[in-house]
Curated annotation (Swiss-Prot):
Keywords, alphabetical: Oxidoreductase, Pyridoxal phosphate
Range of residues in the leader sequence: none
Pfam families: GcvP2_C (PF21478), GDC-P (PF02347)
Record's protein name: Glycine dehydrogenase (decarboxylating)
EC number: 1.4.4.2
Source organism of this protein record: Rhizobium leguminosarum bv. trifolii (strain WSM2304)
Protein family membership: Belongs to the GcvP family.
Any one annotated GO CC term: glycine cleavage complex
Gene name linked to the record: gcvP
Length: 954
């Protein structure tokens, strides 16, 4: 028994987030791991890994790290500085009700938000089905043939539509027409995209200003930003006669009541699915949609889910037509986009599944009736309301009373839209209550009640929808919440996410997404703020963003940041535009050559071509380093026109190259700028700063280094940091500073997920972030050391170390045992692991990145699985296993394999419970190996017929 005199206070800190929650290995485990690698201390390992020339001089310091509770209190204090008013601003952003069953079971569920992009289809069947539902929903509502699995936002989708039009149009014109009734942010992004490519943008009234022979395409808003509903059928026919492409940007909820773009003859439809249950969140993230005619599906950007079969012939889903994506076609890709908005697309699809066609149509009708009632009240006050026919948006001529009425509305708790100097706009939505209408009437000087008016319709009779939509049974079978909950659970059980096991994907940084970091994103003070509210209503957001920028500057050594890019690829694009604008401002607009090493990520060359640059490829040496002689020769050869180089650091081969400063100096000496891709920043935070080693601009993947979850393939954030001389050329936005160059629909991109990164910084502190980097490097070197002998590690530094990831070579197994990298990846599924990154940056290899969040036990389990796979390959080499009928070739194994007739020359136990696999909580792949060739040859990108569901259940 302890006596009072024996009692001692402990120095153990149970709420130390960095060391007790975020970082996986304990101090004792780190000591053991260091011994395996051959070091006595963590600092010794770091000194042996990073070249001295790139080490930052001063430690990363900012205040004491907060506990989870302290950070949440700070976030609450900051959130309370935002004013949550009812916003009827519209302009593509609308109030919506997120069904609680979707909020709790998807948005707040790590089984959904911690998954990776579904490149491994066998362990992604749940997400893929949800995305197929999304594509079916979009195809039905737009009346078009093929939809992708979402894009970044509506404005980006419109710009991508323009790029498709230029690519596939028969017309040789170099101008694109934009309906003046498009949303301002859409027009801004189209201008940004067109200018460096030399395309003229004509903005005007399509019925008076459009001559189809002058353009390669045109985009129309439906309904328009000010409420007009036009029939574009005739204009579209004229465009087709001239060989031009038609695009309709359509409100997805309005399409339940209005004639679809496909029925008008449109080639492409784009829009946002935000109002299908996704909060506005000060601008995002939201899932944009794109649908196209079948003839142009191969030119569509982004990801496309299709139906295939597995090795048993059962239905299985996969990503289709991947050969058109940037990671394969590089500068010849349809787009640089490698991020969808999967989590948000899943939410939108589940909104449709939950409500069904009757429910969604009823919501649309109610929204329209509210808009009509609003118009009747304003007309009774003597105001002229436009247009005569509308869906949810009206515009009121108020003359010199505009400012007075806008202020009066704010006093009533309502934001209205300022339109020019004499008009006010308002868009009604699902959340609009009778009290809101009465508040607006009071702001206009009226004192009416809803009961004073009879509901009616003001939709154009000639454009009423008569075609069916959402006819597939999936949109009719989950009305009861019990069934909805089970359906969501069934889908999530088919997937492998971070809530089950480590996801060791190289260059992806699948680290912990802590629950405390995730909680604030659904607080109304963050989720219910319209992106275009007056600045004084978003003071909390601005304070948080400013502080996060200050911290990111401290981390990177840059002087300024733009938080606008809402993906890493968008960040690359924005950074290259910033460089281009810098050269133009200096009278050197002719500089258009971009040097890119062959090892670069596919987004790099794709982004360069999007800003009109010419890509010059630089060789890479056998050890993975950039060939300095070739780099020097090409920099000097193109000195007169050199715009920039794009490099990744640490390199895409997982090594800190020692010549990086020399490369930066070479570029600067020849008049160029250095773009350092921040994809691997998780190996640098607190140890090295891009801005100190010669880089001029970088994007950071907040969904990697700073803990925003991958969401199964989005959302992401790719803010760009720049040195001071580039700061004046960062992206502008029409709704904030009015400057050109917008790259995202909202000024701060996907702002509602920024609390995740901010709280991560608050809880880790500078010292904790630095420790996380060190442990990420430790974990990678531990795996590389443990696998040594079984697999070759392709690239190491002169000291024999890797950075935060390593590439192991599985190519020898092809010759010795007929085992491919795909076989290894699928066998890892049997062990309960997502495969590392396959065949990039070197074909036939695996890139492994464990991150700092994984415990030694999990690292050992993974190594045990990899070593066991090598032994299985050795058994094939020695003739102890058949070369064709073996656990590697037949992987992954399913429950159907386990209980079915067994005729294989190895045991069920060996098949289903290899080393590393859990016995009690084993993850079972829901399908056998998916047939990729079949899926592309028999392309089906909407929900299969109901009969196939019945067959699957048998």
């Amino acid at each position: 028994m302890t006596t009072p005199t024996e009692f001692q206070f402990t120095d153990y800190q149970p709420y130390d987030f960095a060391n007790r929650r975020h970082i996986g290995p304990s101090p004792a485990e780190m000591t053991d791991m260091l011994k395996v690698i051959g070091y006595n201390s963590l600092d010794g390992l770091i000194d042996g890994t990073l070249p001295p020339a790139i080490r930052q001089k001063a430690p990363l310091v900012w205040g004491a790290p907060m506990t989870e509770r302290e950070a949440l209190d700070k976030l609450r204090e900051t959130a309370n500085k935002n004013k949550v008013l009812v916003s009827l601003i519209g302009q593509g952003y609308h109030g919506t009700i997120t069904p609680p069953v979707i909020q709790r079971n998807i948005l707040e569920n790590p089984a959904w938000y911690t998954a990776y992009t579904p490149y491994q289809p066998e362990i992604s069947q749940g997400r893929l089905e949800a995305l197929l539902n999304y594509q079916t929903m979009v195809c039905d509502l737009t009346g078009l043939d093929v939809a992708n699995a979402s894009l970044l936002d509506e404005a980006t989708a419109a710009a991508e539509g323009m790029a498709i039009a230029e690519r596939v149009a028969k017309s040789k014109a170099k101008a694109f027409f934009v309906d003046a009734d498009c949303h301002p942010q859409t027009i801004a992004l189209i201008r940004t995209r067109a200018e460096p490519l030399g395309w003229q943008v004509i903005v005007g009234n399509p019925f008076t200003d459009l001559d189809p022979v002058d353009v390669f395409g045109a985009i129309f808003q439906y309904p328009g930003t000010h409420g007009h509903i036009n029939d574009f059928t005739g204009l579209i026919a004229r465009l087709h006669q001239a060989g031009a492409i038609s695009i309709v940007a359509a409100d997805i909820l309005a399409l339940t009541l209005l004639k679809s773009p496909g029925e008008m003859g449109a080639d492409i439809a784009v829009g946002s699915s935000q109002r299908f249950g996704v909060p506005v969140g000060y601008g995002g993230p939201h899932a944009a949609y794109m649908a196209v005619k079948d003839a142009i599906k191969r030119s569509m950007p982004g990801r496309l889910v299709g139906v295939s079969v597995d090795a048993r012939g059962n239905r299985a889903y996969r990503l289709s037509l991947q050969t058109r994506e940037q990671h394969i076609r590089r500068e010849k890709a349809t787009s640089n986009i490698c991020t969808a908005q999967v989590l948000l697309a899943v939410m939108a699809s589940m909104y449709a599944v939950f409500h069904g066609p009757k429910g969604i149509k009823a919501i649309a009708q109610q929204v329209h009736q509210k808009a009509v009632l609003m118009a009747k009240g304003l007309e009774k006050l003597g105001y002229k309301v436009e247009p005569e026919s509308f869906f949810d948006t009206i515009t009121v001529d108020v003359g010199h009373m505009q400012g007075l009425i806008l202020r009066a509305a704010v006093a009533e708790g309502v934001n209205l839209r300022k339109v020019g100097d004499t008009h006010i706009g308002m868009s009604l939505d699902e959340r609009t209550r009778p009290a809101t209408l009465e508040a607006v009437w009071r702001a206009f000087g009226g004192n009416f009640k809803i009961a004073d008016f009879e509901p009616s319709y003001r939709l154009p009779k000639g454009l009423l929808r008569t075609s069916d939509y959402l006819t597939h049974p999936i949109f009719h079978m989950n009305r009861a919440e019990s069934e909805m909950t089970r359906y969501i659970r069934r889908l999530s059980d088919r997937d492998l996410a971070l809530d089950r096991s480590m996801i060791p994907l190289g260059s992806c940084t699948m680290k912990l997404n802590a629950t405390a970091e995730m909680l604030p994103i659904t607080w109304p003070e963050f989720s219910d703020i319209h992106p275009f509210v007056p600045a004084d209503q978003a003071l909390g957001y601005r304070e948080m963003i400013d502080d996060l920028i200050e911290k990111l500057c401290a981390v990177t050594g840059y002087d300024a940041f733009s938080m606008q890019p809402n993906s890493g690829a968008q960040g690359e694009y924005a950074g290259l535009l910033t460089i281009r604008n810098f050269h133009i401002a200096n009278g050197e607009g002719h500089r258009d050559v971009c040097l890119i090493p062959t090892s670069a990520h596919g987004t790099n060359p794709a982004s360069a071509q999007m800003v009109g640059m010419k890509v010059v490829v630089v060789k890479v040496r056998e050890n993975g380093d950039i060939d300095l002689d070739d780099f020097r020769a090409k920099a000097e050869e193109h000195a007169a026109n050199l715009s920039c180089c794009m490099i990744t650091y640490p390199s895409t081969h997982g090594v800190f190259e020692e010549t990086v400063k020399e490369i930066c100096d070479l570029v600067h000496a020849n008049g160029g700028q250095v773009y350092l891709d921040g994809a691997n920043m998780n190996a640098m935070v607190g140890l090295s700063r891009p801005g100190d080693i010669g880089s001029d601009v970088s994007h950071l993947n907040l969904h990697k280094t700073f803990c925003i979850p991958h969401g199964g393939g989005g959302p992401g954030m790719g803010p760009i940091g720049v040195k001071a001389h580039l700061a004046p050329h960062l992206p502008g936005h029409p709704e904030t500073d009015g400057r050109p160059g917008a790259v995202s629909a909202a000024a701060f991109g996907s702002a509602s997920i920024l609390p995740i990164s901010w709280s991560y910084c608050l809880m880790m502190g500078g010292e904790g972030l630095t420790q996380a980097t060190k442990v990420a490097i430790l974990n990678a070197n531990y795996i590389a050391t443990r696998l040594k002998g079984a697999y070759d590690v392709l690239y190491k530094s002169k000291t024999g170390r890797v950075a935060h990831e390593c590439i192991i070579d599985t190519r020898p197994l092809v010759d010795s045992a007929g085992v491919t990298v795909d076989d290894v990846a699928k066998r890892l599924i049997d062990c309960g692991f997502h495969a590392p990154t396959m065949s990039w940056p070197v074909a036939g290899t695996l890139m492994i990145e464990p991150t700092e969040s994984e415990t030694k036990a999990e690292l050992d389990r993974f190594c045990e699985a990899m070593l066991a796979i090598r032994e299985e390959a050795r058994a094939i080499e020695d003739g102890r296993m058949d070369k064709v009928n073996n656990p590697l070739k037949n992987a992954p194994h399913t429950v159907e394999d386990l209980v079915g007739e067994w005729d294989r020359p190895y045991s069920r136990e060996q098949a289903c419970f290899p080393p590393g696999a859990f016995r009690v909580d084993k993850y079972w792949s829901p399908v056998n190996r998916v047939d990729n060739v079949y899926g592309d040859r028999n392309l089906i990108c909407t929900c299969p017929p109901v009969e196939s569901y019945a067959e699957a259940a048998e």
